Amino acid sequence: MTIDINAIREALPHRYPMLLVDRVLEVSEDEITAIKNVTINEPFFNGHFPQYPVMPGVLIMEALAQTAGVLELSKPENKGKLVFYAGMDKVKFKKQVVPGDQLVMTAKFVKRRGTIAVVEAKAEVDGKLAASGTLTFAIGS
C-alpha cells in the first residue's frame, strides 16, 4: 500500500520547508518505507554548502523520524497527536546526500512501551547506506 503526499500531510503536522517525506512506498503494522526526492531547491542548500551542496545529516535523521511518524500518526488511536524525539543512538552517516538523490527511508518499530517507541531506521541512496540509527520517540497529544 502506498501513501501519497495528501495523506502524509494529514498524518504529519510538518509543512514546507520542514516536511521531508514525499511518498510512502510500503507500510505494514510496524515497518514503513518512504522516499524523499532531494532537489537543489531545498532551502538548506543555500548555506550548506553554497559551492558543494550536501544535505545536513541532522535533516536526514529528521526525514527518518518523519517517516516513522507517518506510520505512528496514521493509526486511528494516534490521530491528531504529535511525535517528539526522545533520543538518537548509534547514528552513523556513510554517504553524502546531494541534489538529485532520492532517499529511500525505512523505519521499523522494534519496541513499544506506553507512549515511548524505539525505531531502527536507515536511509539509502541507490541501494547504498547513507545514514542509520536507533530513534526513540514519545507520543504526545
UniProtKB/Swiss-Prot annotation:
The gene is fabZ. The keyword Zinc-finger does not apply. GO terms for molecular function: (3R)-hydroxyacyl-[acyl-carrier-protein] dehydratase activity. GO terms for biological process: fatty acid biosynthetic process; lipid A biosynthetic process. It comes from the Bacteria. CDD domains: FabZ (cd01288). The keyword Membrane does not apply. This is 3-hydroxyacyl-[acyl-carrier-protein] dehydratase FabZ. The active site is at residue 48. It comes from Streptococcus thermophilus (strain ATCC BAA-250 / LMG 18311). Belongs to the thioester dehydratase family. FabZ subfamily. GO terms for cellular component: cytoplasm; membrane. Its main location: cytoplasm.
